[in-house]
Amino acid sequence: MHNLSLFEPGRGNVSCGGPFLGCPNESNPAPLPLPQPLAVAVPVVYGVICAVGLAGNSAVLYVLLRTPRMKTVTNVFILNLAIADELFTLVLPINIADFLLRRWPFGEVMCKLIVAVDQYNTFSSLYFLAVMSADRYLVVLATAESRRVSGRTYGAARAVSLAVWALVTLVVLPFAVFARLDEEQGRRQCVLVFPQPEAFWWRASRLYTLVLGFAIPVSTICALYITLLCRLRAIQLDSHAKALDRAKKRVTLLVVAILAVCLLCWTPYHLSTIVALTTDLPQTPLVIGISYFITSLSYANSCLNPFLYAFLDDSFRRSLRQLVSCRTA
């Protein structure tokens, strides 16, 4: 369902916003039938992502909420990332049902809710990663200068997280407003129904997502890390700062790894948006297959972060083992 993957390839409504590289014009009479291998592979891949994501993010939430020593500033942001991923994987079965049934059976309220959750997933990851990058900027710079970051507390991190959720809610609200049920080729679909001219509004929605969901947060993150590297080059670390730097290196590595995986999963989708805005690709089986691959890659981001925590965070591994052993004892 990515950036409304509730929409089908090749459908006639020019408000198409799904994961597809091209947008069909209004004269297309019917959607192209999916190749049989793709019709089988897509729900299987979505199902695996859903199962792995639910299990992994549930484990992350369990550890972070039940272990007192895991209540750190960085983990507040990781907790919110896990909540966003968990919400998305919880509604992914509805996407799978929509794909298999080829129609929307869940009503308009659920349509608006699923569209909103989908958009939360699109925007929240990079927004929280921008906040985590800003936090790393302050911590690493303060470490290099042998000082503490004033006001960096667990409570402050929670307040910032609430502010991020409020901002994301404002950003995704237009999608929920435009989402509604519409009859297309005799089937009821959950789609974005834009005012006239639809083509203009469709392009505006894709540009809106590209700028607010990718260009601004990624530019902010890049600016933070470039500025940090330039500042560090000008600072001579003393022995105390070097010791602190080594102690905090794993946390910084974890944040950078989460960011790298997020960009790997989301960049192809946003590049496809540029293609959709600048070209008029036909809805061929190849284009549809590439589009579903891009969608699946963006979905996969919701199940990969727990593996990063398990491999890169010793505290997370220890806490998870202790909680599991306590439950089985």
From Swiss-Prot:
Regions of this protein lying in the Cytoplasmic compartment: 64-74, 135-159, 227-250, 301-329
Main localisation: membrane
GO cellular component annotations of the record: neuron projection; plasma membrane
Cited SUPFAM superfamilies: Family A G protein-coupled receptor-like
Coiled coil regions, renumbered to chain: none
Domain of life: Eukaryota
Gene Ontology terms for molecular function: G protein-coupled receptor activity; neuropeptide binding; neuropeptide receptor activity
PROSITE patterns on file: G_PROTEIN_RECEP_F1_1, G_PROTEIN_RECEP_F1_2
Disulfide bonds: 111-190
Cell compartment(s), UniProt: Cell membrane
TM regions (residue ranges): 40-63, 75-99, 115-134, 160-179, 205-226, 251-275, 286-300
This protein's UniProt keywords: Cell membrane, Disulfide bond, G-protein coupled receptor, Glycoprotein, Membrane, Receptor, Transducer, Transmembrane, Transmembrane helix
Membrane topology label: Multi-pass membrane protein
InterPro entries: GPCR_Rhodpsn, GPCR_Rhodpsn_7TM, Neuropept_B/W_rcpt
Positions bearing carbohydrate: 3, 13, 25
Extracellular side: 1-39, 100-114, 180-204, 276-285
Gene Ontology terms: biological process: G protein-coupled receptor signaling pathway; neuropeptide signaling pathway; regulation of metabolic process
CDD domains recorded: 7tmA_NPBWR
Keyword Transmembrane helix set for record: yes
Job of this protein: Interacts specifically with a number of opioid ligands. Receptor for neuropeptides B and W, which may be involved in neuroendocrine system regulation, food intake and the organization of other signals.
Family the UniProt entry places it in: Belongs to the G-protein coupled receptor 1 family.
Protein name, per record: Neuropeptides B/W receptor type 1
